UniProtKB/Swiss-Prot annotation:
This is Myb/SANT-like DNA-binding domain-containing protein 2. Pfam families: Myb_DNA-bind_4 (PF13837). The lineage of its organism: Eukaryota, Metazoa, Chordata, Craniata, Vertebrata. It comes from the Eukaryota. The gene is MSANTD2. Residues 1-62 are annotated as: Disordered. The keyword Ubl conjugation applies.
Amino acid sequence: MAAPCGSELPANSPLKIPKMEVLSPASPGGLSDGNPSLSDPSTPRGASPLGPGSAAGSGAAASGGLGLGLGGRSAASSSVSFSPGGGGGGAAAAAAAACRGMSWTPAETNALIAVWGNERLVEARYQQLEGAGTVFGSKAPGPAMYERVSRALAELGYERTPSQCRERIKTLRRCYSRVKEHGVGKRKSSYTFEQLEQVFGQGGWDAQPCQPVLINSSGLYQELESDGSTMEDYSQEDWGNHSQDLHGYPTDQELDEIPVTKRTLKIKQESSEEAQKRDIMQNIVQILESVQLKWELFQSWTDFSRLHLSNKLAIFGIGYNTRWKEDIRYHYAEISSQVPLGKRLREYFNSEKPEGRIIMTRVQKMNWKNVYYKFLEITISEARCLELHMEIDWIPIAHSKPTGGNVVQYLLPGGIPKSPGLYAIGYEECIERPLSPHMEQSSLDPGKEGRVDLETLSAQASLQVEIEPTRIIYCYLGIAEVRTLQQCLFLHFQANTKTFSKDWVGINGFLSQNCIVDPGVSPKSIYIKFVEVERDFLSAGSLVECLEKAIGYPLKFNN
C-alpha cells in the first residue's frame, strides 16, 4: 500500500523494492529513454528520490545517512529506494534528484506527451503563426507552461511537479533528436517516434478533444520485462512498427466482433445525416452567392470585437485559399439564427473551440494559405423564414370525396397554432421524363419481333413514364400578423366554392380551382408548413425576397 508523501515508516518495517525496470549503465554519447540522472545501475528504475521539504527524507539523511523518498502518485504505485551516502553529500544528491524527478511509468509518459502537445499547440496559436510555416515557435517554454502541464497531469491522476515535467520533456526531446539524426534509439519505449515527431517536429499536433488515450502500463511493463530486449538498439523504422501495439485503438479482432447489421445501419444513418447537412450547407452557400457578398480576410482577433457584429443575426460563410490556388472556396456556411454573429464567428476563429481548432490546424500545416469570412445581416423574421424553409417539414392537406358533382373539400389538420407567424403553401409537382434507354431499346429491338416479352409488356402497361421523387413547389408565403395562423389558413382553404368567380386571382383562386375536378381525376396534392413568430418581429425584413433567394425561384402568388 502506497504511503503518502512525508509520512514516517516504522523502524522495523522492511523496505520492499518493487520489480521495476533497471537502467543500463550510462554510456558516452548514448541516451536512453529513462531519466539520465538515474543512470546509476544500483538504483532501481522505480526509485523515488527525496522531494524538497520532505520531513521523512531530511530526518533519514541526518540520522542514518540514508535518503528515503516516498512518491505519492494516484495512478501508479509508489516505490521506496535507498542509496548509501554521507549526510551532506546525500542531501545534496537528493535535492538534485528531486528536480529531476522519480522514474516515469509508460502511462505517465504518454499522458505527458499528450498534455505537452496540447499546451504547445495552444501557445503557438497565440503567436499568430510567427514560425513562418512551422507548427511551434522557437520561443522556449517558460515556467508557466510547466505549471499548466503539471496541473493537467494532476487532473489525469498523475502527481508531478513542474520541475519533474521539465526534466522529462528534456529527456524526451533528446531521445527524439537522437533517432531523428542518427536513426537509432537506445531501447524500447512506451511511446512511438510518431508521437515525438508530433510534439517536437514539424508535423503538427492534433489537439486532444478529451482525455488522452493512455497505454495499459501494467501490460506494457510485462511485455518489456519478458522479452529481454530492453538493451537493444532500434532504428527509426522499428519505432514506427511498434505504433500499432502502443496505441489504444481497437484491433481487427475487436472490430470483427461488432455485428455486421448494426455496423451497416450505423453507416447508413451517418451517411444520411451527412447528406442532409451537405444539402443544407449548399442551400446556404447558394443564398450567399446570390447576393454577391465580398470576402473579408481574417487578420486578427479584433476583427470580431467591432460593435456592429455583436448582437446581429446573419448568414455567414467561412472560406479559404491555398498557396497554389487563389480562388476562395467555402469551408463552412451557416445561418446564425439563435446566436449573435459576433459570438458565432469568434467560435470559428477561437483555437479552443472545435470549429476553430480545425481551421487553425489547417493553416498551421499549410493546407490553407488565408482564411476569409463573409456575412449577410438578417432580421429575426427573416431567420424564422429561413428556418421555415430548411427545418420545417411539409404537411399534406387531405381532401374529401367529390360532393355535388365535381367539387372536393379540403380537410385542414388539427394543431394549427392560434398565434402569429409565417406559413407557406405548396403543391406537388410530378416531372415526367422519357422512357429509359434500356426500355426503349428492348421495345425497338428487331431481333425480338414475333416474340412476346411478358415482363416488358407488363412494365409498359403499368408505367408509361418514370416518375421523379416528389418535389413540392412553393407558391405562396403568408404573414399571419393581424390574424393568427389558424385563421389565415382557414380563410384560404375553407373558401366557399359556390361564390367562386373567374375574376379571383392569387392563392385563393388557385386553391378554389383545384377543388373543381373532372370525373376520375384527383386534385393536386397541396401542402402547408408554418412557424410561430412574435408579432413585433413580423414587420421587419423582406420576407418574400428572402424566401425566393433561398428556394431559387419566384413565388407565383405573392406578386
